[in-house]
Amino acid sequence: MNQPGLWVQLDHLSGPQRTLLQHLTFGVEPGQCLTLIGPSGVGKSALLAAIAGTLDMLAADDTPPLHCQAQVWLNGRCISGLPCHQRQVGLVWQHPTLFAHLTVAQNLLLAVPSGAKAQRLRQVSQALERAGLAGFESRHPATLSGGQASRVALMRALLAKPEALLLDEPFAALDPALRGELRAWVLEQAKTQSIPVLLVTHLAEDIADPQRVLELSNV
C-alpha cells in the first residue's frame, strides 16, 4: 500500500481460547489521530502491540501467546515482518516501562538520535520542561508518581522521532488539568511532525476528533 501514514489490514487476532478481533481494516493519515474505544478485554492493547511488533511481550510466563495475522504499512513500506526495533513505531503503555537503574535523563537519552552529548542533553532538558518536569534529570523512576512516569514515557517516545505513535491510555494516571494540557501538546507535536497517532482510551475527553473513532467489539 503505497500511501503515507499507518494502514492496517487485520485478518485475525486470537488467543488459545477465542478470537479477539477479525476482518479489521483501517488507516491513519500523517498528523491525524484515530481513537480506539471498546470494552475491556476486546483486544485494544493487543492490537497496538501487534502493530508495534511486541505482541509476544504481552504473554505472561504461564499464558500462551496471542497470534495475529495482519499486514501493516507505514509510509508506504510493509513493516509486518520486521522486528520491533526496525518498525520506527513509538509505543506508550498505560503503565510506563522505564529502566529503574537509570535516571530520568538517561532513560530519555536512549531515545535521542546520535549527536553531540551537550546537544542531546539540551534536547532532554527541553522535553522535560515541556512536560512540566524541569529539574527531574537526576531522578530515578522509583521516585516518580504514576503521572510523572507517564510523562517521561511520552517524551521518550517523541524524542525517538517515530513515524507512527501508538498510545495505550497514557493520560489515565494524570490529573484532569494536566491530562488535557499534555494530550493537546502530544497531538500538536504529532500534527507538526506529520506522525499518525493511534490512541486507546476509555475517556470521552481524550477523543481528539469525534469523526475519527473506531469502536472495537468482541467477535
Name what the model sees in each region.
Residues 56-59, 83, 102, 106-121, ...:
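ABC-type ATPase nucleotide-binding domains, specifically the catalytic core motifs of the NBD
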Residues 66-68, 74-94, 114:
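ABC ATPase NBD coupling module
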Residues 119-136, 187-188:
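Conserved ABC ATPase "signature" region
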Residues 140-144, 148:
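Conserved ABC ATPase signature
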Residues 159-163:
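A short, proline-enriched helix->beta-strand linker immediately N-terminal to the Walker B motif
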Residues 165-169:
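Catalytic Walker B motif of ABC-type/P-loop ATPase nucleotide-binding domains
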Residues 194-201:
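Conserved H-loop
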